[in-house]
């Protein structure tokens, strides 16, 4: 029996977390997004934006936000974290 295959629409935090959760259960997931990079909405926010919740409450399942990003994670660091999340979980992407 071959593993199930799922397409997840959106390479933002929700889509990436869904793909990681599926992968943890042995389900192959492909994340598709019309933009060319993960976390595209975060990339468009203003430069000085920080998360409004502390780092320890803001991570996605299976990979906490690293301490090096500080307690109040900046916009650029959220983007970097999402990219690390993809690599950590080996999430398959089809972007653009």
Regions found by a protein language model. Give the residues of each.
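N-terminal Rossmann-like FAD-binding beta1-loop-alpha1 element of flavoenzymes
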Residues: 3-31
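A secondary-structure boundary/capping signal
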Residues: 9-12, 34, 61, 95
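Short polybasic/polar patches that bind polyanions
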Residues: 23, 56, 87
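Helix N-cap at the beta1-alpha1 junction of Rossmann-like dinucleotide-binding domains, i.e.
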Residues: 36-38
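Glycine-rich active-site loop/strand segments that organize a redox cofactor
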Residues: 40-81
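A conserved beta-strand/loop element that lines the FAD pocket in flavoprotein oxidoreductases
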Residues: 87-96
